Amino acid sequence: MAVCAASRRLTLSNVLQGVYRTELVRQHAENSAINFYAQRLTRPALTAANSNPWLSKRSFSTSQAFKDGGNIVIYDVIATKAPDGDVLTELTSTKAEDSPKTPKSPKSSSEKPKSSKTKTKAAKKSGTKYLASELVNPEKKVKRPHWQTQKEALEKKFTEGWHPRKKLPPDSLDTIRHLHATKPDVWTTPVLADQFKISPEAIRRILKSKWQPTEEERERREERWAERYKKIYSHMEELGLRRRKGEWTAKVSDARRLGLEGKSIRQNFRRKPQARPEGTEINISRPDREASPKESTSLE
């Protein structure tokens, strides 16, 4: 046979216990419980849970409330205003017989700030210890190679880099050295830098260097310059910026006078005077003066 589980709960002891508790609820509700909870609802008492928001969020009850189970039932009945039938069903259930488990008592409100203070003190101590360890044992700086420091110094000195916009020819370098050697007080480094439009550091390095080209290097340089000038002059002649080298310029050249260059095909560039026999007279007209005597005009 199947037995109903709800019928097992309806024992004599459970029914008597429920009736006794309902009468206690009525007596307390009529006298003191109504006033007490009404005051509590209208003006809540200042407790640790109200003062501390952390504790107010947590739902817990005091040990006295757990000892007296009737107080909990009174508060629930007054707040909800449930009928007596509902109360009887709740009381006759097995949940009422089971003793409520006492939860762990939470930490008091006075312990929390102490713990926070201790945490802050510990954090400060750890921070001071860390700073002290940094001061006592600073990290060793990695030593950079010599070439890197030299490169940074050269970059600061030469802002334009290794390929400057203006490059001086060898003749200008020799001129700079000669001027500084003859009159170092007049041709100082800033003056030379301003004159040749380069940086003072470049002037210092030019004066400091003692390199001199060899004879072979000089000959190669002269040949290279001659070819360069020929190209430049021929291009200028094609554009009409320079006159072509003619015969009249060849006659006046130093090479012609020294006999290093052959005579041109047209030797008689100007007309020669006609040959006159000896004893002929040359008449020179002078409009402002009188005629010269005949003896002075005769050619011997």
Curated annotation (Swiss-Prot):
Residues 91-132, 259-300 are annotated as: Disordered. GO terms for cellular component: mitochondrion; nucleus. InterPro entries: NGRN/Rrg9. It holds the Pfam family Neugrin. It is found in: Mitochondrion. Residues 1-67 form a transit peptide. It comes from the Eukaryota. Residues 115-127 have a biased composition (Basic residues). Required for respiratory activity and maintenance and expression of the mitochondrial genome. Belongs to the RRG9 family. This is Required for respiratory growth protein 9, mitochondrial. It comes from Talaromyces marneffei (strain ATCC 18224 / CBS 334.59 / QM 7333) (Penicillium marneffei).
